[in-house]
């Protein structure tokens, strides 16, 4: 297997390979934009043939298959992606990780019908999210063997080997309408916080490498230099946020836009809607649970000796409108089998927990869940009686609460 050795960067030559422009001291230039649509008209370049390449992405779906308040569901997400593909046949569809874990629906179905969903959209690959490890490494490796093409440049074995179930990068070759071809490399990156945000047993035998080092190995000093590809895109499950001056949230990833050879960054993890540029590199993220899809458009000019590619605009598109009948039928079957379409009728009032508004606050849902923990503890026959007379406090991580409980319906 290919060995990935970590060395200290000590020479000026390597530093020049590391960064673009004036090097590590280049000021961070951030262009912040609100959600917008790109209606750029591609001008005809005399003597050359132009075309448009679109990168369509979604992230942090978290198994949100069923349509609910604020969650469009798998059917609408799929149809929104297909609509974009109809507008431009030169479209590559990508996931940025955290695909299946996160909903009760997903847990009891073990991620189904995600394979059919990915197949319908022709998802080329996925970054590895921290929640990909929730159900253990065997599930992840089996999933990769069946239907998921994972990319993970900064996850290696603790022996320094690359992974058997994921590649550091994957190259997609598209035959364009102009008669040419374009080759795009997608380098996968995962938040290094995964090392302490998931069960140690689930990542046993793995190591998480500094993302800037891993991306550099797979970009300037490898892919572009060897002339293998026309573009390099970072597909990173690392948080971004429009409120952050540097856009990228994690300290060890802030220099990624300054790596020589990086043409775009498609991000996930922080559940934000992001469309911006750092160091003239476009950065995008498409919310959570399929609420949005991201789209980056590039002009491809066919010239003698290769392609000239430039970014022409982006869009964060809200998922809405018609739903895909095939995917809806699969979801409905699962809902019927497990009784998930039935409504609770005991709650007289809605218990509100909106993660976009009061995620960090005391909420009725949080109180209800932690009270249930206390009651379960007190009613457990295995708990010694002397412990039950002591004060008992229920504690729940705020990230585990993801939805409200609707008001019940009166019957009879």
Indicate residue ranges for each PLM-predicted region.
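N-terminal secretory signal peptides that target proteins for export/translocation
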Residues: 1-6
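Acidic, metal/ion-coordinating pockets
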Residues: 25-321, 364-372
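N-terminal leader/targeting segments
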Residues: 14-17, 159
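Non-catalytic terminal accessory segments
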Residues: 8-10, 16, 23-58, 62, ...
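Alpha-helical structural elements
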Residues: 13-14, 128
């Amino acid at each position: 297997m290919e060995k990935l050795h970590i060395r200290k960067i000590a020479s000026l030559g390597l530093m020049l390979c590391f960064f673009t422009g004036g090097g590590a001291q280049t000021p961070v230039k951030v262009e912040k934009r609100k959600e917008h649509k790109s209606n750029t008209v591609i001008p005809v370049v005399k003597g050359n043939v132009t075309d448009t390449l679109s990168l369509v992405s979604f992230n942090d779906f978290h198994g949100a298959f069923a349509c609910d308040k604020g969650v469009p569901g798998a059917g609408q997400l799929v149809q929104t992606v297909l609509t974009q593909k109809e507008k431009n046949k030169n479209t590559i569809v990508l996931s940025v990780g955290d695909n299946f874990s996160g909903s009760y629906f997903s847990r009891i179905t073990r991620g189904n019908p995600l394979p059919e969903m990915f197949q319908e959209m022709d998802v080329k690959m996925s970054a590895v999210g921290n929640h990909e490890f929730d159900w253990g490494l065997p599930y992840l490796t089996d999933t990769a063997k069946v239907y998921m093409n994972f990319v993970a440049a900064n996850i290696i074995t603790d022996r320094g080997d690359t992974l058997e179930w994921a590649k550091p990068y994957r190259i997609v070759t598209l035959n364009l309408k102009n008669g040419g071809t374009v080759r795009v490399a997608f380098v996968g990156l995962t938040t290094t916080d995964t090392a302490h945000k998931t069960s140690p047993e689930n990542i046993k035998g793995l190591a998480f490498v500094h993302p800037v080092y891993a991306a550099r190995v797979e970009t300037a000093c490898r892919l572009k230099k060897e002339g293998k590809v026309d573009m390099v895109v970072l597909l990173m499950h690392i948080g971004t946020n429009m409120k952050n001056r540097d856009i990228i949230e994690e300290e060890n990833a802030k220099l990624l836009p300054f790596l020589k050879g990086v043409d775009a960054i498609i991000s996930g993890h922080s559940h934000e809607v992001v469309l911006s540029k750092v160091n003239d590199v476009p950065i995008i993220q498409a919310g959570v649970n399929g609420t949005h899809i991201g789209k980056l458009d590039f002009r491809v000019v066919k010239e003698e000796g290769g392609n000239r590619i430039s970014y022409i605009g982006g869009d964060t598109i809200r998922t809405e409108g018609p739903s895909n009948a095939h995917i809806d039928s699969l979801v409905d079957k699962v809902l019927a089998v497990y009784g998930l379409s039935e409504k609770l009728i005991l709650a007289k009032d809605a218990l509100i927990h909106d993660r976009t508004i009061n995620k960090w606050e005391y909420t009725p849902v949080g109180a209800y869940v932690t009270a249930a923990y206390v009651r379960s503890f007190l009613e457990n026959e295995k708990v010694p009686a002397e412990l039950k007379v002591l004060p008992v406090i229920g504690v729940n991580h705020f990230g585990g609460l993801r939805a409200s409980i609707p008001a019940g319906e009166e019957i009879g």
